[in-house]
C-alpha cells in the first residue's frame, strides 16, 4: 500500500499495491503552499515514508504536544482557553523524506521539520489549505487510515 497526497485537490488517497483505491479523504495542507525549506510553514513535496506511528490507543480528540499525549481531550472550551494552539489530535503519522537534498537532510528535512499526518478539531475545514505544514485529517478518518498503514508505508506528496 502507499499514500498519495494531492495538494491541489486537498485529498489523501490510500492505494493498494496494484493502484486500486482503498480509501480517499479530504484533507487540509499548508496555508503557505508547497515547499521543503525549514521554517517555511509549507507542506513538503516528494517521496516520503511513515517513519513512526504515534497514539495507537489514544481516544479520539486526544491532544498531543511534542508527540506526547497531554492528558487533555480537545473540546470547544479547551480551544477557547488556548486559541493560538496548533491542535494535533488523535493520532500522528510522522513523515520522513526519502530524497536527499529535496526533503531529507539539511534545511529541507521533513522529519526534522516535524511534518505529520494528524487529526484536527471537528471545526477544521477540510478540502481547503490551512495548516502550518502538516496534513490535517478528520479524527475518525485518521483512525481508519492509521489502522490500515504500517511504519515504512510510502507517501508521495504532489502539487497536482
Name what the model sees in each region.
Residues 21-25, 48, 113-115, 135:
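Short beta-strand segments
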Residues 60-160:
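Exported/periplasmic cell-wall-interacting domains
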Residues 35-36, 58-61:
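Short, solvent-exposed loop/turn elements at domain surfaces
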Residues 7-9, 22, 45, 88-90, ...:
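Extracytoplasmic
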Residues 35-53:
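Short, surface-exposed secondary-structure junctions/capping segments
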Residues 1, 26-40, 73-79:
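N-terminal post-signal-peptidase region of extra-cytosolic proteins
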Residues 4, 13, 49, 92-94, ...:
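Soluble periplasmic/extracytoplasmic beta-strand elements of cell-envelope proteins
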Residues 1-33:
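A structural motif detector for short, solvent-exposed N-terminal "entry" segments of globular domains
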